[in-house]
Amino acid sequence: MTDTDIKSHKIEFPCNDYPIKVIGDTSVGFTAAVMEVLEKHATVDLKTLAERQSSNGKYTTVQLHIVATGEDQLRDINSALRATGFVHMVL
């Protein structure tokens, strides 16, 4: 991949349809904690909300789209999600 290819894949903000995937331990409060953080930091498209458990039920994935306004916002979301204690990975 060339430098030109990398630059052409850079996200342009605001991005009205930015996908977020959050993976964490399956627990009663996981989805609520994820939603609380996302709704605090961004406009959330609830129509895109999808929740799925792993085959063994140990992990849950929450996916949805947000309005992303910039890299600082995305860093803040990542930090806040990890601070919940539920989250293993944010994609």
Swiss-Prot record:
InterPro entries, per the entry: UPF0250_YbeD-like, YbeD-like_sf
GO cellular component: cytosol
Gene3D superfamilies the record matches: 3.30.70.260
Protein name: UPF0250 protein Psyr_4360
Record-stated family: Belongs to the UPF0250 family.
Pfam assignment, any one: DUF493
Organism in which the protein naturally occurs: Pseudomonas syringae pv. syringae (strain B728a)
